[in-house]
Swiss-Prot record:
Activity over temperature: Optimum temperature is 35 degrees Celsius.
GO CC field: cytosol
Keywords for this protein: Isomerase, Pyridoxal phosphate
BP-aspect Gene Ontology terms: D-alanine biosynthetic process
Domain of life from the UniProt record: Bacteria
UniProt protein name: Alanine racemase
EC code(s) of this entry: 5.1.1.1
Source organism (scientific name): Pseudomonas taetrolens
Pfam families in the record: Ala_racemase_C, Ala_racemase_N
Amino acid sequence: MRPARALIDLQALRHNYRLARELTGAKALAVIKADAYGHGAVRCALALEAEADGFAVACIEEALELRAAGIKAPVLLLEGFFEASELALIAEHDLWCVVHSLWQLEAIERTQLHKPLTVWLKLDSGMHRVGLHPKDYHEAYQRLLASGKVARIVLMSHFARADELDADATAQQIAVFEAARQGLAAECSLRNSPGVLGWPQAPSDWVRPGLMLYGATPFEVAQAEAERLQPVMTLQSRVISVRELPAGEPVGYGAKFVSPRPTRVGVVAMGYADGYPRQAPNGTPVLVAGKRTQLIGRVSMDMLSIDLTDVPEATVGSPVELWGKHVLASEVAAHAGTIPYQIFCNLKRVPRDYIGE
C-alpha cells in the first residue's frame, strides 16, 4: 500500500478544545467545517461529543452528515441557509442557524415552521463580508423575536485581523459590536481561534475555536498561549528511492534545484495530488529518520524529493514527516506562501488513521 497517510491524534484534539475553554471560561463550539479542516468531521465530532458544547459547520449538508452519524449535540450553520426551503430541515434536525442578511430574516418571517429556531444574528462589525449593518441590527433582533419563529438569539460577529496582535482593527470591531448590542438581552460570540488565544478583552459567552483545535497557530509570530497547542495531524510517508548525484545535476521538473555539491537525493511518496503544496520551495523543512532536512526540486503530482546528504542513515523505507509534531504545519505553510488552514483543507487523497480515541 502507498505509504502516504495522515495520522490524526484525537487526544490532542481534545486537549486543544479544553484549552479554548480554559482560556475563556466560555462555552465553545468546535468548528469542524470543511471536513474538520481535512481531519475528518465525523470522527472529530465523535471524539469531542462527550464534552463539546456544540459544533459549527459551513452549511446544512455538513450538518446532516453529523446527524446521520448520530451526533446529537447542537450544530451551528455558519453560513446560515441559502434557500428558504432549508428552514424546514433546520427545524427538523434541531440545527442552529446564522442569520447574516435581511433576506434570510424575511424568509424566516414568511415560513411556517413546526418548531422555533435558535438563531445566531451576525453583525458586520468591520470585516465587510457578511453580516447585518449596525443600523439594522436592533430592528433585525426585534423582528426575529416578534416573528414567533425564533426561541433564542445569540449575537455574533467575526474578526478580520485578530491574528495581527498589534493591529487596531480588532479593538475597533469590538467597539462596534459592543455599541450594536447595547440593550439587547442575549448571549454573544466574538472570539474565533486568534480571538481565544490573543484577545481576552473580547466579550464572548460562546467561542468558536477552529484552527486552534487542530493544533496550528493562527499567528505569524510566537504567542504564549498558542505554544500550548498540540498538533493533531501528522502527514507522513516513506522514502521510496535514493540516488547519489554529483555537483551540478538538476532535480525534478523545470530543474528548479541544481545540486551545489555531491548530493544524496531521496524521493518520497507524497505530492500535490495528496494535498502537499506544489508551491513549496527548495528549503521547506521535512523530517526523515527523525532528523530535519529539506525539500529540493519542484513538488510533483505524486512525489517530492528531499536532501539526504546529511542524513546518511536514511534509506528506502525510512519514515518521513511532512508536517506534524516536529515540523509544524505553520512552518510548511509559511515556506509555501500560504496558511495552515489551506494546506489542511487540501488533503483529499491521503487516507487517515486515528489514535487516541
